[in-house]
Amino acid sequence: MTIFDNYEVWFVIGSQHLYGAETLRQVTQHAEHVVNALNTEAKLPCKLVLKPLGTSPDEITAICRDANYDDRCAGLVVWLHTFSPAKMWINGLSILNKPLLQFHTQFNAALPWDSIDMDFMNLNQTAHGGREFGFIGARMRQQHAVVTGHWQDKEAHTRIGAWMRQAVSKQDTRQLKVCRFGDNMREVAVTDGDKVAAQIKFGFSVNTWAVGDLVQVVNSIGDGDINALIDEYESSYTLTPATQIHGDKRQNVREAARIELGMKRFLEQGGFHAFTTTFEDLHGLKQLPGLAVQRLMQQGYGFAGEGDWKTAALLRIMKVMSTGLQGGTSFMEDYTYHFEKGNDLVLGSHMLEVCPSIAVEEKLILDVQHLGIGGKEDPARLIFNTQTGPAIVASLIDLGDRYRLLVNCIDTVKTPHSLPKLPVANALWKAQPDLPTASEAWILAGGAHHTVFSHALDLNDMRQFAEIHDIEIAVIDNDTRLPAFKDALRWNEVYYGLKR
């Protein structure tokens, strides 16, 4: 059972009565065949549901209205099987508030060269039916995606599936509640922002709860529940001598388990799926939540440190998008550099809170060590290195008049040396196209020091995210050149200024 089982995508066929009942019968037959095949063979993340043909303005408007009010409907896939005059779609599209994709396909893959006639031509008119639909989308400034390809083509399946992930994540985001335990880290700018504007743009709500409210729940956790969770730790991780049953830090592990159980209970009771903490506001907690946060992220919760609610929300959104995909997604921070000509590297980490979903496939180490920040008892944490390979880091920032998403494509590499004195999870990567260009572009665009790191998602996923939410995106990859990047930022300033 995944979040995608809670949603469905409606498959809508556009046509008209001009061609007669027999043509519409064939259109319906083709649609049923295609939808059944896609549901069976395409490995789509959620189910396609075929709706009645859209052959008149009233029918199309009714479908769009019903889609808006059906909580299970994540979006619409439209196939213009025959020509479907686009003025019929204006009223429906003008009220539609769900994501929209045009599947530019046709029932047959190859033309029947010897038998093709005008009946065949009238039945299979995606080539210009899709263009008519595209015009009205452009004319109405209607954001929608387009996937071209035969319905049996695996590349088309992959692209539709990726769009479905965006559609579902958008619906989930509209219900997302972010809990901030305490406020922002004092005097930090980028983690702040306009929470009302964020709710208007994305749909998620952000509110603050006193740490004392959390502490009350944490203190209510009984020893039996703690013992059961400790048993899970024992079976899942390699515990250092200090954290084992007779170790001098065993009580710290028990306290970490108490915090994890209390946090999870608090989040579940409040319906929260993302949260923040800050080391400056821990009154009543015996240690900074480290292990608890790591394990909650692995269960799908969004998180960011120092009150950074935008990154916490983005992490939750990206975890929904990547559900079921290979690779993990985590809160991350660009921490320090390794400057070496031709081999510049970024070491990413945080004080404690890196998600185990990105870890190498080996038993993780559970340890308790001193943390100088926060002024509390030594916290428990999982220590690991990160899987290697292509990845991205993404940052969502508030520019006052709009949101900007920054994405840097990176290549995660193996740590060349052991890190015996670094008791935190970490990731090591090469930034594309190189560290000087990537860091300068990131800084010029205002990117945060907190990011979401993902092996599971790629640049195309984040481009779709920006499009479906109608926000700016700034991309840093192997094609980035600083003069052109600066120009793009200037052009975006003008474009979004005119768009307000």
From Swiss-Prot:
Cross-referenced Gene3D superfamilies: 3.40.50.10940
Catalytic activity entry: beta-L-arabinopyranose = L-ribulose
Cofactor(s) in the UniProt record: Mn(2+)
MF annotations from Gene Ontology: L-arabinose isomerase activity; manganese ion binding
Pfam families (alphabetical): AraA_central, AraA_N, Arabinose_Iso_C
EC number: 5.3.1.4
Any single Gene Ontology cellular-component annotation: cytosol
Cofactor note (record): Binds 1 Mn(2+) ion per subunit.
Protein's GO biological process: L-arabinose catabolic process to xylulose 5-phosphate
Pathway assignment: Carbohydrate degradation; L-arabinose degradation via L-ribulose; D-xylulose 5-phosphate from L-arabinose (bacterial route): step 1/3
Keywords recorded for this protein, A-Z: Arabinose catabolism, Carbohydrate metabolism, Isomerase, Manganese, Metal-binding
Binding-site residues for Mn(2+), renumbered to this chain: 306, 333, 350, 450
Record CDD domains: L-arabinose_isomerase
Enzyme class name: isomerase
Family from the record: Belongs to the arabinose isomerase family.
Function per UniProt: Catalyzes the conversion of L-arabinose to L-ribulose.
Cited PANTHER family: L-ARABINOSE ISOMERASE
Quaternary data: Homohexamer.
Protein name listed in UniProt: L-arabinose isomerase
Organism: Salmonella choleraesuis (strain SC-B67)
